[in-house]
Amino acid sequence: MSYYQLDARRLLCPMPVIRTQNKVKDLQQGDTLEIVCTDPGALNDIPAWARINGHRVVSSEESDNEIIITVQVG
């Protein structure tokens, strides 16, 4: 299991979700991906995408105008 980070700052909907989806395609089951973004819609969109696609949201938080969502690949 490996840890990866995706910088989706300054991207607007739907790009954070699309970039997340593209990155996850390259990862293995059990890997962890931390997505850093600034689009408030991502706080709902990425967890919804993760659930639909069998991944698990480990955490989501807002800090210094950034949203950090951690997903474990399912």
Q: Where are the language model's segments positioned?
A:
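Absolute protein N-terminus
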Residues: 1-2, 74
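Short amphipathic
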Residues: 2-9, 34
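A generic structural signal for beta-strand entry/edge sites
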Residues: 3, 32, 64-68
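Residue-identity detector for glutamine
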Residues: 5, 21, 28-29, 62, ...
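Generic structural detector for well-ordered beta-strands
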Residues: 7, 36, 70-72
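Amphipathic, hydrophobic secondary-structure cores in small proteins
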Residues: 15, 19-55
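C-terminal structural segments of small proteins and small subunits
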Residues: 47-74
